[in-house]
Amino acid sequence: MALTPGWGSSAGPVRPELWLLLWAAAWRLGASACPALCTCTGTTVDCHGTGLQAIPKNIPRNTERLELNGNNITRIHKNDFAGLKQLRVLQLMENQIGAVERGAFDDMKELERLRLNRNQLHMLPELLFQNNQALSRLDLSENAIQAIPRKAFRGATDLKNLQLDKNQISCIEEGAFRALRGLEVLTLNNNNITTIPVSSFNHMPKLRTFRLHSNHLFCDCHLAWLSQWLRQRPTIGLFTQCSGPASLRGLNVAEVQKSEFSCSGQGEAGRVPTCTLSSGSCPAMCTCSNGIVDCRGKGLTAIPANLPETMTEIRLELNGIKSIPPGAFSPYRKLRRIDLSNNQIAEIAPDAFQGLRSLNSLVLYGNKITDLPRGVFGGLYTLQLLLLNANKINCIRPDAFQDLQNLSLLSLYDNKIQSLAKGTFTSLRAIQTLHLAQNPFICDCNLKWLADFLRTNPIETSGARCASPRRLANKRIGQIKSKKFRCSAKEQYFIPGTEDYQLNSECNSDVVCPHKCRCEANVVECSSLKLTKIPERIPQSTAELRLNNNEISILEATGMFKKLTHLKKINLSNNKVSEIEDGAFEGAASVSELHLTANQLESIRSGMFRGLDGLRTLMLRNNRISCIHNDSFTGLRNVRLLSLYDNQITTVSPGAFDTLQSLSTLNLLANPFNCNCQLAWLGGWLRKRKIVTGNPRCQNPDFLRQIPLQDVAFPDFRCEEGQEEGGCLPRPQCPQECACLDTVVRCSNKHLRALPKGIPKNVTELYLDGNQFTLVPGQLSTFKYLQLVDLSNNKISSLSNSSFTNMSQLTTLILSYNALQCIPPLAFQGLRSLRLLSLHGNDISTLQEGIFADVTSLSHLAIGANPLYCDCHLRWLSSWVKTGYKEPGIARCAGPQDMEGKLLLTTPAKKFECQGPPTLAVQAKCDLCLSSPCQNQGTCHNDPLEVYRCACPSGYKGRDCEVSLDSCSSGPCENGGTCHAQEGEDAPFTCSCPTGFEGPTCGVNTDDCVDHACANGGVCVDGVGNYTCQCPLQYEGKACEQLVDLCSPDLNPCQHEAQCVGTPDGPRCECMPGYAGDNCSENQDDCRDHRCQNGAQCMDEVNSYSCLCAEGYSGQLCEIPPHLPAPKSPCEGTECQNGANCVDQGNRPVCQCLPGFGGPECEKLLSVNFVDRDTYLQFTDLQNWPRANITLQVSTAEDNGILLYNGDNDHIAVELYQGHVRVSYDPGSYPSSAIYSAETINDGQFHTVELVAFDQMVNLSIDGGSPMTMDNFGKHYTLNSEAPLYVGGMPVDVNSAAFRLWQILNGTGFHGCIRNLYINNELQDFTKTQMKPGVVPGCEPCRKLYCLHGICQPNATPGPMCHCEAGWVGLHCDQPADGPCHGHKCVHGQCVPLDALSYSCQCQDGYSGALCNQAGALAEPCRGLQCLHGHCQASGTKGAHCVCDPGFSGELCEQESECRGDPVRDFHQVQRGYAICQTTRPLSWVECRGSCPGQGCCQGLRLKRRKFTFECSDGTSFAEEVEKPTKCGCALCA
């Protein structure tokens, strides 16, 4: 209610003081009770259609139903619904909601229904419904959702109805519906779906409604599973059709054969299509703020899907990402910076960055990129920074940078580029800095242009140098004269180790042959060359690769075999292979032979051989394998020969060879098998399998030595006590605290204080950042293959000279954000491969000269955010970073005062001067003894490991001598005890305890209750030096020795003259009538079950009540109503036709039509039931025929029957043939044509048949599905418009002629129901037809018959009947086939089950008796019995008797029961025009029946009003409130 100052109702102005009172009251009520513009009724808050632009505030916490539909809300924030823990129904449809923040629904744990349809949602955040376990119905239809992420519905485990139709979904991530096991309804129709992950719907056993039609399904080999899934469920997923390829377009998916789902090419068949989610929210493993998505160091192996569309920067560095897929970043058009540095990226799709018009920084350094695809940087017009350094790029196309006109810094530093084509940098008009150093440039005539370019544009700042020819080696390119760049046959223009491929400016070079190897006839011979790793570049045509007799120790997972599609044999025998990385053979599906004989393998696991799908021969002879577990050979299903000869195998786990399905030869000889109980299974397995084994023999125990395994009896395989639990388990490849990917181990942010056990020995990257390390773990030196160590964000305060020993392969060391103050001079000794060192964010002030003497490869030093003291002692560092720009210009000086804030990189070295000794704080960082850390006069000594060490005087200890040895100094005695120090004794001190305490430190309270004197059940409570007694209710005194009389006048608790009775448990009050409670203080409410009627008010009295009647009523219970004249009925003057009754509905006359009739006065017959087979309807006066649009609804359970027929020679016929609709049409052409519906309609349900005839074309559609079309291209004739239109059949002579001319295939008349026949959009009235006998009005019988396990047929001879499913019988298909009627003995009658075990016989006319076996019974035993309110029923036991209607009793059903409410649950129906409309779901109410005393009527006393959706027979729908009674009683007749 809105109030305006000074104005009230229409009666006139309100006084100011009265307005203030009203305003204050309205403010108090509105602020706490209901949001503005909303209506609150009970627990329902209705805010629909009020123009809201945001969720209103102050929604009551107890709200159960909230209606916000029909507003202008644009966004749902996280806290909009906070605190609404009781909400069950939330209506948000028909708004403009574009985004819902994650967590918005977290508080609504009771939410059951949520409608978000008809909004503008583009994305669905993951985990949005994670706390809505009670959610059963979710409507997201008619939005713009583009993708369904994997965790979209995680948490909504009780979801039964999910509607996603009419969106723009093009991507469904695998597992998106996995949690929805109870789903019954799923709609995905009218989207842009092209493919669906395999088995997406297999876990939905209750699914009964499923829609997938109107999508863009591409029916290739990846969608073959869907066809089989739909065929197994023929009643759901109807009209799901293929949109491609062209040969399958328009076909139903379920009808396409498996062989027709094909993929072109082997690569496509193996590649399961994936989709990049076009919009999303912050990934769970990342952090997002201010448009920046930070996923650094999260162990990612792929770019996350479903990222925020609005992000401007994404940080993905320090992960394990191996490739950038097509369009990976294209959806994120606002991106300005992408950082993918320090990953494992080897492949980039050409369109990975397509469309990023705002991108200005792209960081890709520290990866494994070898090639830049054509056009990969196309369209990046605003790019200013491009870092490609520290990769393996060997070739740059001339047009690689043609769109980068605004690029200012390009780094190609540290790659494998040997030459650059002229014009590569021509388009870089804004370039200011170019890094080309650390590349093996061949300075021949092809590179002359680069020298000229660099002299003209001195922008190359990293010092790029020549590597070849020898005369120009190590000279800076920009300083060499042009004439020196020449091509000569006398010079060698290659770099040793790189001449295995040909140079080509287009980067399409094919490998010639690996260095030092021989290549002949597709055989690459690289044996006996002392190789330590497999050559990187091998010709793609290679069929056999010989690498035997080398020194290879580790087989790395480089993906090199993906390009060798012709490779058949790999020989790695006689090497030093001790480790094979998981996935090392990925892509080697064509390899059939792998030889690993004579190596150093100690264990094997299935991941080592992943990718060898076609392997047939695996040779593992002469290794060090000790056991075989059941994961050793998983996936090698094609292996026929497996040799494990001459290893150290002692045991084999059960099932170890079960996955080798093709195994025919297994060599286990020369192994020391221990034939104990763990190997008992193998003897039996070898005997049963028909494979060649060579009879392996036992080595242990002694009594079985040299006995073949197959010959050992099962009882002889026995174990000593305690050995049963042994066995062979796979070696753990990753610590429990860490995550491992290939050779990358991530143990970040795990609160570690020590290095976890189980780190693989071949680890190359180890991430220990974000932990609690105080020192560098000493075990790091045992991992000799380490290339990267990240120890940032720990608490490391010092390094030693041995912290990084034995790490010769280390290239990246990150020590940033620790507490380092001083670096020892030999801390980095031996790190000759180190390229990147980060000391950023520590407390370092100085570094000793020569500290980087061994790190000759160092190119990046991060030392910023340190308080550098830039005096003469740091001058060397300034000069060192300037050579090669090793420091990026971040580090600044913190002292002396005149150097404060100056950059280490740009400040001239001469400025670094010593004007006196550094401050004591600076000196103490590398000489902590200067800060006097030792306390209590301890002596400080420098220590190379612990930085310093204190020598403590007598009486003190600790690192800083801070701990006193005086045992009483810490006050060990508690509770006021006195400490006495002891010298030379076992105990360093003793305590003198006060009274009430004891123990070594006086910490124990003495138990004074040991000898207590509490009597009569009193409880002793210990105190300090004493105790007290807690007495029962009826005792008192210090020891509970005195009995208390609780019923004495002073203590009597009973009120209102109640009698007090003493009991052992205390006093008990016996109350007077009318009172209750423990002390009889409560006056009983006698009005609780009062019988006052007609709105009378009950007045409570002592032990009684009285009724205060409303005006005009009288009687003790106000049951006598006033005398009023009977009102005039609205039905007077209303004429209802065809036997309809007029009823009063809200003072409005309404005709209640009989079944089959419709119209305001029931004047039209709209539905008919064909009960005889030889009958029909005949229309003779039709307009605009034969150009007609015919629609009708049909229900039948028959296979054949005529629906429509018109014409003679030139005809149109519609018939039911074998359950399908068949249309035959002949407008004058010959021969006539016919089409059939794909659907069957003989299931007893109503189906809509739509037929459009226009000249020579006919369209047929069933239930609004895709139409079937037929064209006749003969000479056009007009059909005979004078011939009648027959419905449901036709005369015998017409039938015979049509059958003879093949116009119909089955002449059977229609048997079933037809309703709502429209011809040219005009609803037909069957009363205006020639109706033959056998056609009856109405199709309602099946609404009265419920079939539990079957389908209702409305037109059976005895009336509606159920066609039961297999295994069910009975009138309602509710009895099992093997129920009590199975094998019944009814002779002349029908068996009727009474319960699960017994039955009775319902006799035919003329028979009686319990088994209907007595002839001569009266044909009509009920003839003389007149039941007033019921019907007569005869049985063999009771004879003829009355069965009364509900509400009546008596022998003749003559007695009406008292007013009562009979519960009803059914659909509610109304009539609108000619259409019959009913609610979409049943509702519950009570029917008031019975009699009332006097002149009262039995009617509803309590009514419930709710809004329901109605669906009408003409296809329309609407919503309307329905009012139904929920409680009945006697009241004044209305």
From Swiss-Prot:
Keyword Signal annotated: yes
Domain LRRNT intervals: 34-61, 273-309, 504-540, 725-761
Record-linked InterPro entries: ConA-like_dom_sf, Cys-rich_flank_reg_C, Cys_knot_C, EGF-like_Ca-bd_dom, EGF-like_CS, EGF-like_dom, EGF-type_Asp/Asn_hydroxyl_site, EGF_Ca-bd_CS
Location of this chain's protein in the cell: Secreted
Record GO biological process: axon extension involved in axon guidance; axon guidance; dorsal/ventral axon guidance; forebrain morphogenesis; motor neuron axon guidance; negative chemotaxis; negative regulation of axon extension involved in axon guidance; negative regulation of synapse assembly
All residue ranges annotated as the LRRCT domain in the record: 215-265, 439-489, 671-721, 866-916
Oligomeric form and interacting partners: Interacts with ROBO1 and GREM1.
Name of the protein described by the UniProt record: Slit homolog 1 protein
Organism in which the protein naturally occurs: Homo sapiens
Gene transcribed to yield this protein: SLIT1
